[in-house]
Structure formats: structure tokens, C-alpha cells
Amino acid sequence: MFKATCNSRDFKKVINATSNLVDEICFEVDETGIKASAMDPSHVALVSMGMPKEVFESYEGDIHDIGIDLEALKKIIARSKGDEKLILELDDEKNKLNVTFKSNVTRKFSIALYDVSSSNLKVPDISYPNQVSIKAGAFVEALKDAELVNDHITLKVDEDKFVIYSKGDLNQSETVFENNNDEYETLTEFKMSEPSKSTFNLAYLKDLTKSTSAEDILKIYLGSDMPVKIEYEVSGSKLVFLLAPRIES
């Protein structure tokens, strides 16, 4: 069985962040909570989410793989209002996920499930030389600046600085965040073992940060020509994204 109750606002944020990159996913449900991982159709990005049972007001779950049409779920969750209670319940007999919103009224939906099993995808255990933690709002603004110049972006760590830049045929954009020299405390953590530089598809970075709030803290793990790993939390739930670099000749 599976039945869980939570705040609809928090669940919406997790689903929106995940569905920005993938259309369907397998929820791996057990007594500890919900987890899921999936690759985007181009196999450029991997998304992983984890919602431990502690983030739910109530939670009952044994081992199930629940194949979800994320786009359908996203549209239903978008109908939530304010801090409505959200109840998710698996109907094994009808092979559906029931979604209920509770406030002064009760609204019910059901979603047909895919017959899928766990992909067994895991976020690779990669050792990164560098890590920066940055407010999401500042990172997103730097992406918007870079978008004016090119559709690729370079993330660089060097000399106590985190640099985001983009270069076109004629124009260039650069945003520099200096460690220990930021009155707005935009960088909350900076760990550098060696200089690094990698280039990424800008559209993917926009998608995986689209659902963040300005004050969310992004943990960004970097190395030269390595996939970038970005982590952040939503009220106790954890989101992890891995994006392959663009290898320049």
C-alpha cells in the first residue's frame, strides 16, 4: 500500500523541478519515503529526487514501483491552492494514483499509472575538486545575462572566484562571485582544490533551476570537463541534477 499526506505547495515545487527535465518517472516507494531518478530523453542530464517520510504529515508505504506521467501529475498539482493538504494514495486494483486536495472543500483526481519498474539509476559517486554554494537567485540572474550572448555557458573556479561567462562571435557576458568579498553573502560556501573550467548547455541549466526560489541555496560541484552536479533542498526533500559538459575541440 501507499498513502501520504503533505503540504501541496512543497510537493508542487519538487514535481515542477523534476518535470522540467523528464516527462515520466518511476517513484520508488518504501517504508522510508519516496525516491526517483531518471535521464532526460537526450541522456545529457540526470535528475534524482528524494522525499523522506519525515517531510509528510502522515506516511504509509511498503515497496512499490509507481510509474508516473509527470506532465499529467504536474497539471493536477498546478490546481492546488495555497497550503491545501495533498493526499496521495495508490489504488492497486485500478492501477491508478489518487490525488486529493483538502481544504474547506475536497477535490479528487486519479492518474493512470505506467507499467514500469525501477530504472535503478543512481547519481554516480564522483569525487569533485571544487564546490561552491550560492543563492539560486544570483545564479539564475547570471544565466539570464549569459543567454544574451550564447546558448552555452562556462562555469569556472579559480583564484578564490566563481565565474559564470558566455562568449559569442562578437559579445561576451561575465559574472564574478568573489569568495569572502560579498556583502550580500551570495556565496555561502567556497571549496577549491584546483582551478577548473567546464562548458554546459545553457537551456538545461535554466530548466534545472527554473523552480528554485531566490533564497534557495544551490550546492554546485565542479571539475574541468566533468559533469556539473547541482543539489538543493525543498522543505526537507532533496533534488540532485547531473549535467554532462560540452567538450570543446
Swiss-Prot record:
Cross-referenced CDD domains: PCNA
Keyword Nucleotide-binding: no
Record has DNA-binding as a keyword: yes
A GO term for molecular function: DNA polymerase processivity factor activity
Alphabetical UniProt keywords: DNA replication, DNA-binding
InterPro entries membership: DNA_clamp_sf, Pr_cel_nuc_antig, Pr_cel_nuc_antig_C, Pr_cel_nuc_antig_CS, Pr_cel_nuc_antig_N
Function: Sliding clamp subunit that acts as a moving platform for DNA processing. Responsible for tethering the catalytic subunit of DNA polymerase and other proteins to DNA during high-speed replication.
Similarity remark: Belongs to the PCNA family.
Quaternary structure and partners: Homotrimer. The subunits circularize to form a toroid; DNA passes through its center. Replication factor C (RFC) is required to load the toroid on the DNA.
PANTHER family the UniProt entry points to: PROLIFERATING CELL NUCLEAR ANTIGEN
Protein name, as recorded: DNA polymerase sliding clamp
UniProt source species: Methanococcus vannielii (strain ATCC 35089 / DSM 1224 / JCM 13029 / OCM 148 / SB)
Gene: pcn
